[in-house]
Amino acid sequence: MLAFAARTVVKPLGLLKPSSLMKVSGRFKAHQDALPRLPVPPLQQSLDYYLKALQPIVSEEEWAHTKQLVDEFQTSGGVGERLQKGLERRAKKMENWLSEWWLKTAYLQFRQPVVIYSSPGVILPKQDFVDLQGQLRFAAKLIEGVLDFKSMIDNETLPVEFLGGQPLCMNQYYQILSSCRVPGPKQDSVVNFLKSKRPPTHITVVHNYQFFELDVYHSDGTPLTSDQIFVQLEKIWNSSLQSNKEPVGILTSNHRNTWAKAYNNLIKDKVNRESVNSIQKSIFTVCLDKQVPRVSDDVYRNHVAGQMLHGGGSKFNSGNRWFDKTLQFIVAEDGSCGMVYEHAAAEGPPIVALVDHVMEYTKKPELVRSPMVPLPMPKKLRFNITPEIKNDIEKAKQNLSIMIQDLDIMMLTFHHFGKDFPKSEKLSPDAFIQVALQLAYYRIYGQACATYESASLRMFHLGRTDTIRSASIDSLAFVKGMGDSTVPEQQKVELLRKAVQAHRAYTDRAIRGEAFDRHLLGLKLQAIEDLVSMPDIFMDTSYAIAMHFNLSTSQVPAKTDCVMFFGPVVPDGYGICYNPMEAHINFSVSAYNSCAETNAARMAHYLEKALLDMRTLLQNHPRAKL
């Protein structure tokens, strides 16, 4: 069970005005308290939607068997009704009946490494510096931009986001700074110091696998300027010219149980414990990377994506990370930059809103040179490495190397059109892209598959995500019709429009809390909590097929010309993320090399062809002008 690619369909914030210095106390709480609570959908409604979603992905025999199980489950006075009542009681007692369960199930109890399997990476536009000065100047400006965004969070002046005219829960913005995941033997935890009595005033900077604590506020509480931060980054760079022989950070890339053991080992030592505490408490991390290995232009972006997602291995930049840290910004010597974030705290949109703000901020000219004041030397974080820890580091290096070699990742910039074309056809760009994904997959494999697209539940207090299931009866009818020469072109157009509209309708239901995936998960977890034997519908082949997402997808729109990416959630699947810009679309496609049936470049090729064929179909049969 993976971080379920929980990434969402939300309008980006746009550039926020430089933050007001006036603190608006209580505004955040008042806004949050006014949000509706997440409803528990009616049982029969969810089960009907479940049966409908199974039709394109399971055989007729399997479907008929599941229909029987569903009927038994929802008999009057039966187990389904009992579990539903339990969920409804839970919903009355809690601020959000799902959020705590979801955090545990999707993230904290997930035992695979966070690297590749859970934490998304982001590629930002390549910067035009090519030397150390440029790298440090840009990093300093980026840090100043994040602190500017942070002041809006601190002062509660962050503009509220809206979706379909409804205000959204802003809680995730309060989770992404000064927070960190902590490994545990069976379940991890997340620590957050933003609201502590003495909130942290430092960030972590990593260079040559060495960690530094850099104070970014003066004693009077004002933030350092980018000029002042630049001077501090130079000091860090000059005091870490050689790579650390023991890249402690690489331990965070391991399987969670393995890392939990190594972590307990590591923090037995007081010096190590203090260093780890400093990293966990820091506002965020900045990784000053070596340049990405030189490769031809067409694969350069794929290499950069790897650097952002996993660091490229122990010979490159993987030791320059603390993967448990919620936010890590990465700036390399050659101008490539981006970030990786730990997924437990938030979905993509709050991260992208921060990125949009920061990238816009980095373009602002320095109007005044700030006065040079004497600043203390940034503190180097020391680690005492025992033979046992050294051995743990070696094992982590080997495991990471295997994971990296298995990842097949491809960046695609689709130049032919952007969201402008579907909009001109009065079609939702997101739904249009999702139907193209269905067409691409069907053309390769000759069948539909369980497809996950993340839907935001942020209309509700503490809402995270639910699932939009893109493989539908209507999408299957379209992709079959598209390959059938006996189907008239005009009918193909109608099938396409119907498939896009069906996806749009599912999306609208999902963001209103009426999708069935989280509801079924809730019923399953309620059964575990009530210690009743697991109902048959959850032990059924159809349920296993429905939860095996061969396509795990997400739209993460941004104003910045960037794209997010993540690994597939199943061994024989794809991870696909996209940012539809006005006249082009940024895609990322990932697969695993260990699966002979999947190939990221092939999927990207078929996706491009599907989008072009759908455009041609619509252009050849224009809608009648009303």
Swiss-Prot record:
Quaternary structure and partners: Monomer.
Name of protein: Carnitine O-acetyltransferase
EC number: 2.3.1.137, 2.3.1.7
UniProt catalytic activity: (R)-carnitine + acetyl-CoA = O-acetyl-(R)-carnitine + CoA; propanoyl-CoA + (R)-carnitine = O-propanoyl-(R)-carnitine + CoA; butanoyl-CoA + (R)-carnitine = O-butanoyl-(R)-carnitine + CoA; hexanoyl-CoA + (R)-carnitine = O-hexanoyl-(R)-carnitine + CoA
Active site, renumbered: H343 (proton acceptor)
Membrane topology: Peripheral membrane protein
Residues that, per the record, bind (R)-carnitine: Y452, S454, T465
Main location, first listed in the record: endoplasmic reticulum
Binding site for CoA: K419, K423, S424, E425, K426, L427, S428, P429, D430, S456, R504, Q555
Span of the annotated motif Microbody targeting signal: 624-626
InterPro entries tied to this protein: Carn_acyl_trans (IPR000542), CAT-like_dom_sf (IPR023213), Cho/carn_acyl_trans (IPR039551), Cho/carn_acyl_trans_2 (IPR042231)
